[in-house]
Each structure stands twice: as C-alpha cells, then as structure tokens.
Amino acid sequence: MRNPQLNEHGELQHLLTLDGLPRQIITAILDTAAPFTEVAEREVKKLPLLRGKSVFNLFFENSTRTRTTFEIAAKRLSADVVNLNIATSSSNKGESLLDTVDNLSAMQADMFVVRHAASGAPFLIAQHLLATGRDHIRVVNAGDGRHAHPTQGLLDMYTIRHYKGDFTNLVVAIVGDVLHSRVARSQIAALTTLGVPEVRVIGPKTLLPTEVERMGVRVFHDMREGLKDVDVVMMLRLQNERMNGALLPTPQEYYKIWGLTAEKLALAKPDAIVMHPGPMNRGVEIDSAVADGTQAVILPQVTFGIAVRMAVMSMLGSH
C-alpha cells in the first residue's frame, strides 16, 4: 500500500508523521531547509515560492512557538496566511472537524496546518480530502495528541546535523516524559531512519511507553548511566496536561532525579549539545545554568524551525 504522505511519483503530498517516511525524503527536507536559513539574514525576508497560495493554520490546541513559526515560514514564502481562532470558532459551537474542513476548503484553501488533541486528526483530514476529490489541498501535522510532531522532529534533525554533521557515529539520549510526548516519537523515528547507531531513552518507568524498546532504542532508568558518553542530550518536559490524574513527583523531586544539571551533563561527551523542544521548565527538567550554557542549542532550534517549516511547505506547494 502506498504511503499516504506520498503521491504516485513518491513525492511528498502531506506531512503527517516521520514514522515510515523514507530517508531520502527526510534528507531532502533538511537539504531544502539549508538555504532558507540565510533568508532571515536578508533585508527583505521574502521568497515568492507560495505566492497566491492560502495557508490555513488550524490550531485546536494552544500553541505559541509552533503556530508563530509556521506563520512566519508561510509569510516568508509569500503565502496568504489565515489563523483560525478555535476558541471563538464554529468548532466550539458544535461543528464537526470535517465540516470545518469542508467550509474552509470552499474558501479555496491550498494547505492546512493542523494541531489537534486527538491522535490521527491530520490523517483523518487528509483521507477526507482524498475521498471528496480535494487532494490538491496539502495537510501538515503540527502535533496530534501523543502521536507525532513531525516538523519538530525535522528541525531537531536539522539542528543535530548543523552541529554534528554525520548521523551515523552519534549516541543520542532523549530524557524525560517519553510516554506522553509526540515529540519523542517523531525524534526516535527520524533518528533511527537517519542511521543513528544508538538512541537512548532515559526516564522513570512510569513515564516510558511499555513498547519503547521495540522502537529500536536502549532504555535507561538511571540518568547518570544513560548520559555517559552521549553526543546529544534531548530534554523533554513533563506533559502534565496529558497525564489525566497520574501520580506525579513534585517538581523538586523530579528535578533532583531527572533534572539536567551541569554535574550530570559532565558525564556526556565534552562537546555534547543540549536540546529542548520547549516550552522549558527551568528547575524541573533542566537547570538554568545548563539552559543558558555554552552547550545549549535551544534558541538555534527555534530559528532553524522556521527554515525547516519553509522547506516542508515549499516542497508540498510545488507538487
């Protein structure tokens, strides 16, 4: 069966997940993003690649960083951008997701950027567009439930490649609440596809998926042991909003065991980089001295995110 993200020519049609996406597509996105990083340095930060196209940002969950970077990316490509305010929209008045999509499609939308609390919502939209003969409209998953956050995974890969070059000689550690993290799932899919020989996940048993070892990773419940000789440390926040009343340690208890401090970071390689998808909780999963330190590349991740999202939208808009 054909990958629903690719057209009959094997080109990117939607970006829904990094799981199962071919290595050459991921690499092509990273390669396409590289020249877009230079656009930010220009006096006029505009390219005409999506001129005349309409991009609708459909954010059914709160977001600042992701929504803003998608908006900036689309505008730098000269697209017309519509931000749907879900709090006051028809979805709060009982309209279904697909009815909302139908109505926006009737406004000649060319691309939907979708964030939704329900895993699979962007897939549902893409399937609906295909079934109703509107598969010229592209869908980008900006995060769905616990399932996936593909553009975050891609910008993380771009960041690693920028600082480390080759993926095939790295040890990468993902630390924290993997169980509730769509970012972690996208990171693991991309890292394994790109040939990283050792991906580690580090966290308490209660915050790791039961099937995590089947994802091709090494599991550590001792943070100090897991950080030994790693090249990249990817921190994750506690996803309190997805825990549904689970028993949690206090922030102080969590920080003591799982917070990244300078002392714990010293166990990694001397040139290891520290990443975080944001928002960051200082004094919980990461110490301020580390977040603001020379090994942190957290702000460059945000900058690279614009270029990566430009790459995704320009590739989708050209097919």
From Swiss-Prot:
Entry keyword annotation includes Protease: no
Alphabetical UniProt keywords? Pyrimidine biosynthesis, Transferase
Q: Which cysteines are joined by disulfide bonds?
A: none
Superkingdom of the source species: Bacteria
What pathway is this protein a component of? Pyrimidine metabolism; UMP biosynthesis via de novo pathway; (S)-dihydroorotate from bicarbonate: step 2/3
Instruction: Indicate which residues the UniProt annotation says bind carbamoyl phosphate.
Output: 65-66, 115, 149, 152, 278-279
GO cellular component, as recorded: cytosol
User: Molecular function terms in GO for this entry?
Assistant: amino acid binding; aspartate carbamoyltransferase activity
- Record keywords: Lyase included? no
Q: Which InterPro entries match?
A: Asp/Orn_carbamoyltranf_P-bd, Asp/Orn_carbamoylTrfase, Asp/Orn_carbamoylTrfase_sf, Asp_carbamoyltransf, Asp_carbamoyltransf_Asp/Orn-bd
Question: Reaction catalysed by this chain?
Answer: carbamoyl phosphate + L-aspartate = N-carbamoyl-L-aspartate + phosphate + H(+)
Which GO biological process categories is it annotated with? 'de novo' pyrimidine nucleobase biosynthetic process; 'de novo' UMP biosynthetic process; amino acid metabolic process
- EC identifiers of the protein: 2.1.3.2
For the ligand (L-aspartate), the binding residues are: 93, 182, 237
Matching Gene3D superfamilies, A to Z? Aspartate/ornithine carbamoyltransferase (3.40.50.1370)
HAMAP family attached to this UniProt entry:
Asp_carb_tr (MF_00001)
What's the stated role of this polypeptide? Catalyzes the condensation of carbamoyl phosphate and aspartate to form carbamoyl aspartate and inorganic phosphate, the committed step in the de novo pyrimidine nucleotide biosynthesis pathway.
Give the family from UniProt: Belongs to the aspartate/ornithine carbamoyltransferase superfamily. ATCase family.
**Subunit notes for this chain?**
Heterododecamer (2C3:3R2) of six catalytic PyrB chains organized as two trimers (C3), and six regulatory PyrI chains organized as three dimers (R2).
Output the NCBIfam families linked to this UniProt entry: asp_carb_tr, PRK00856.1
Give the protein's recorded name.
Aspartate carbamoyltransferase catalytic subunit
Encoding gene (name): pyrB
